[in-house]
From Swiss-Prot:
The gene is rpmG. It comes from Micrococcus luteus (strain ATCC 4698 / DSM 20030 / JCM 1464 / CCM 169 / CCUG 5858 / IAM 1056 / NBRC 3333 / NCIMB 9278 / NCTC 2665 / VKM Ac-2230). HAMAP family: Ribosomal_bL33 (MF_00294). GO terms for biological process: translation. This is Large ribosomal subunit protein bL33. Disulfide bonds: none annotated. Keywords: Ribonucleoprotein, Ribosomal protein. The keyword Ribonucleoprotein applies.
Length: 55
C-alpha cells in the first residue's frame, strides 16, 4: 500500500548532548535531501541543543 520511497518519511531526531533523547517527525525529501539538524529542547539536560537526523 505505502510507497517504498515516500516523499515525507518519518525520521528520528537524536540529541547531540549524548542523553539518548529523541524526537520523531516527518521531513520533505524533495526540499531537504540531506540530513537535517534542528535546535530543540532536551528535557534531560534542560537546555536547547542540536538534534540530528538518525537513519
Amino acid at each position: 500500500m505505502a510507497k517504498d520511497k515516500d516523499v515525507r518519511p518519518i525520521i528520528k531526531l537524536k540529541s547531540t548532548a549524548g542523553t539518548g533523547f529523541t524526537y520523531v517527525t516527518r521531513k520533505n525529501r524533495r526540499n531537504n535531501p540531506d540530513r537535517i539538524t534542528l535546535k530543540k529542547y532536551d528535557p534531560v539536560v534542560r537546555k536547547h541543543v542540536d538534534f540530528r537526523e538518525e537513519r
